Amino acid sequence: SLLCMLALVSWVGLSLPIQADDLLLDDEFDTEAIFDDSEFSLDNTDLLLQESPYQWQLKQGLVLDPQATQDPTNSYSNLHLTAETTLGLSGFANIDLKATQDWLTGQWDTEIYSSAIQISTQQGAFKLGRYINSWGEVEGAGVLDIINPAPGLTDPDRGFKPQWLVAYNHYMGPREWQLLTNLDPDIAQFPDMSATKQASREWGLRYKVANSGSDWAVYAGQFLQNSPTLGLVNSLEQLTAFEYDLLGFSYNQARGDNLFKFDLAWKQGLGQQVGNDLTQVERLDMALGAEIKVGERQWQWSLSGNYLPEHTHEFSSVIIDPLTFELSLLPSSQWSSQYGMGVSDSFANGEFNWSLNLTGALNGSMTGLISELKWDYNDNLNILFTLAGITANADSELAAMDGLQRVGVELEYHF
């Protein structure tokens, strides 16, 4: 499914020259990580008491280019310390401290990766901290899952990024209101270029109704583009994260073990190169998704598209020459669409889990394949093997990634 798109693009792009890596990132290819709002549930308080309040996790990763014999394209270590506790009978708090070592560059970094305090009542829950908040149904399509930015192409962590959020959920039986604000929206960082942010805050409102076997929701808000728009104005580079308005709708329907999903969003104010100017336009985003279970095997399908109603022949996108890394303009289509197909299963009584995902543009300008095999060696050690490749046309936005292949292994320890 499109869940693998950013996982693929970020992973195979780890060894690209940095000028191409981040400039190629675009909201339309956001993917990876299934969000979950379950922490807002009162039922989870008891589960926290059953687990150890402190946990350590160490990841050691190595990425290689099978077409080359030189040094690895990436080698890293991530150390997480997580702690959580209940706050009386109506709340909980957690924190995840992360330390990262890049063995190729020698760079060392520490951060509060995530942290949250939640206080719940019978009718609602207030949550403050740095965490992931779920919007939309078709994960990774970039239609409504726009609150948490996707990782950059050089980021080994392929999950969506926690944000500093304040949110309140109000429950009315099967209905639910959510009001949230992002106190400091993150945007993708481009090397040697500074981006202009049109806003310092985001806000959003969701009304959700759960029915038997299905639910639907409507959305509204003002947001900042997760990935700034790169433009050429009078032959000069200009990088801007525009503020835009959003109206959206989502729906899902369960049929037995299968789930069918739909997202729709109208976005007003997105950045777009038009002629020699970088301006703001309207866009309609939509996505269809399905999760089909056959026995123990899980199939995922998705189709997403973007429509520019104000499109003219002057609409274009900035692309990077894969050899010179010079910027140029590529005419933009009024419609753009992507697809995703994936399958996952396990064997040896669940000791081994595998997945295979194919994703790309419907016009054939880009195709990517990623496969993973996870070995649960014991309760404390998991080993992940990954193989990926990508092809892209010379006149596409991802031309600099054509022909890339990557093989990786990651060891994950829990103690």
Task: Describe these PLM feature segments.
Residues 16-71, 78, 155, 176:
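N-terminal periplasmic/intermembrane-space "pro-region" immediately following the signal or transit peptide
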Residues 54, 89-95, 123-126, 174-179, ...:
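Repeated loop/turn-to-beta-strand initiation elements of outer-membrane beta-barrel proteins
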Residues 58-64, 95-99, 128-130, 179-183, ...:
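Transmembrane beta-barrel strands of outer-membrane/channel proteins
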Residues 75-81, 111-115, 162-166, 201-205, ...:
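Hydrophobic, lipid-facing positions within transmembrane beta-strands of outer-membrane proteins
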Residues 87-188, 208, 390-392:
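Outer membrane beta-barrel
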Residues 252-359:
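Detector for outer-membrane/organellar transmembrane beta-barrel domains
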Residues 389, 401-415:
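Outer-membrane beta-barrel "beta-signal"
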